Amino acid sequence: MHLSAVFNALLVSVLAAVLWKHVRLREHAATLEEELALGQQSLDPVPGLRIDYPKALQILMEGGTHMVCTGRTHTDRICRFKWLCYSNEAEEFIFFHGNSSVMLPNLGSRRFQPALLDLSTVEDHNAQYFNFVELPAAALRFMPKPVFVPDVALIANRFNPDNLMHVFHDDLLPLFYTLRQFPGLAQEARLFFMEGWGEGAHFDLYKLLSPKQPLLRSQLKTLGRLLCFSHAFVGLSKVTTWYQYGFVQPQGPKANILVSGNEIRQFTRFMTERLNVSHAGAPLGEEYILVFSRTQNRLILNEAELLLELAQEFQMKTVTVSLEDHTFADVVRLVSNASMLVSMHGAQLVTALFLPRGATVVELFPYAVNPDHYTPYKTLATLPGMDLQYVAWRNMIRENTVTHPERPWDQGGITHLDRAEQARILQSREVPRHLCCRNPEWLFRIYQDTRVDIPSLMQSIRRVVKGRPGPRRQRWAISLYPGKVREARCQASVQGATEARLSVSWQIPWNLKYLKVREVRYEVWLQEQGENTYVPYMLTLQNHTFTENIKPFTTYLVWVRCIFNRSLLGPFADVLVCST
């Protein structure tokens, strides 16, 4: 009896402890859901979107974090997480190791050489790296109560949200296509920006990409001390970027550009629809030239004269627009129907991606600034399929520039430099190639005001624009490539001890019958087996007999491919092995 009483007492104690823990867990869950709801209320309430807190907590504590990435290096990697957590106190992401944890790639210490991935699209920038700390899932017992984020998250950094070029090139375009890289993400994801900036001047543009309000790092503190994402994608695709800013070598086009005008225009179509901007005809009722007017620096000092001369030269209306005085939707509406866009070098020129096909971009450069050294907008305008004409004009007359050496250094001032360096900069005729981002000579020159020499500008434009500028109706500009030639065959014959013939034939690529192609040619490579060199032939027919330099009793390797319009090279068919 005594032992039975003791056992019953212990059992009651255990049951009481279990019930107490269950009640506390339910209270815990209710409290956290209320906190999350309150935290989200001012941002973007999501009716009906809740998470089963006890189940989520159990999955995290038992299973841990799960990660699978695409990409071979940190510069091209995007990772998909389940149950990735973030400590607002430590400002670090956490990977909890549990029974079901997966970490692919499992890099060990190589994860810190230098990072798991880039959070922004600016490649290998040491302020944009992403990594996490590791903990056993059991550590959750000693940590703040986790708040589970029910949304699918896309976690990234904005590079410079106050600069329109950076907003489009580094953020919006990559975000747009990253959201479409994974099924359903564009409709479900909430954007989480972790770089630490405030909203910035163009935050409304980021809101267009997702039906859910983006969140900044500073806003996460209102949700809880420890946040856990049930489902998160981390990183951005860099495939749409075309320019590097000069952190390692002087700025210029990327070495391997993978985007075309087609992808740019798909993006701009989406943006104009979200901005409620119509492409149906010019908003002013006629064709016009659009001039970007700057109001604070890099001014065009004879802007009125420039407008008049452009109107007279091209017999078209001229209109000014500025980022300061127009809404961005109005800017897009004007740009997307303009025949020509004229602007000083600057971030506003990224709006050229909204220009219609056949329009002209005219970029003006201040004194001593070489257009060949600063080409983000030239590179954009000349992407395959953008179908824009590009003109660069440079002020070559020192007297036509107004400098501002007294301004702060970040606005081109040079009075903080020693007198010898100031004198050198003032006498310089061209800014040397340099790295980003604080070169005083570059800043001094790029923030100059300019009186445009009208005759030299018109001469520069006329070298490119032969007739009346403006959009033109064009055929589908996408270049379609041939497939492999089919049924390639070879036949050899020997004529005597020193002569031989090699006949090669093939059928057209099967996709050719569905295409309208101006010119079709075939390239044939002949290589004697064992030799390192080959002889190329360009042919118009689907068969040919080779006699020159064909040897008897010799084996030849033969490759054949189709070429459209002299530049669209198809793949080689499988190699033919032909013996004479």
Curated annotation (Swiss-Prot):
Residue ranges, Cytoplasmic side: 1-4
GO biological process, one term: neuron migration
Ranges per topology, Lumenal: 26-580
UniProt feature coiled coil, ranges: none
One Pfam family hit: Glyco_transf_61
One GO MF term attached to the UniProt entry: acetylglucosaminyltransferase activity
Membrane-topology annotation of the record: Single-pass type II membrane protein
Membrane-crossing residue ranges in chain numbering: 5-25
Record EC number: 2.4.1.312
Catalytic activity: 3-O-(alpha-D-mannosyl)-L-threonyl-[protein] + UDP-N-acetyl-alpha-D-glucosamine = 3-O-(N-acetyl-beta-D-glucosaminyl-(1->4)-alpha-D-mannosyl)-L-threonyl-[protein] + UDP + H(+)
Keywords attached to this entry: Endoplasmic reticulum, Glycoprotein, Glycosyltransferase, Membrane, Signal-anchor, Transferase, Transmembrane, Transmembrane helix
Predominant cellular place of this UniProt entry's protein: endoplasmic reticulum
Biological role stated in the UniProt entry: O-linked mannose beta-1,4-N-acetylglucosaminyltransferase that transfers UDP-N-acetyl-D-glucosamine to the 4-position of the mannose to generate N-acetyl-D-glucosamine-beta-1,4-O-D-mannosylprotein. Involved in the biosynthesis of the phosphorylated O-mannosyl trisaccharide (N-acetylgalactosamine-beta-3-N-acetylglucosamine-beta-4-(phosphate-6-)mannose), a carbohydrate structure present in alpha-dystroglycan (DAG1), which is required for binding laminin G-like domain-containing extracellular proteins with high affinity.
Family (UniProt): Belongs to the glycosyltransferase 61 family.
Protein name (Swiss-Prot/TrEMBL): Protein O-linked-mannose beta-1,4-N-acetylglucosaminyltransferase 2
The organism of origin for this protein: Rattus norvegicus
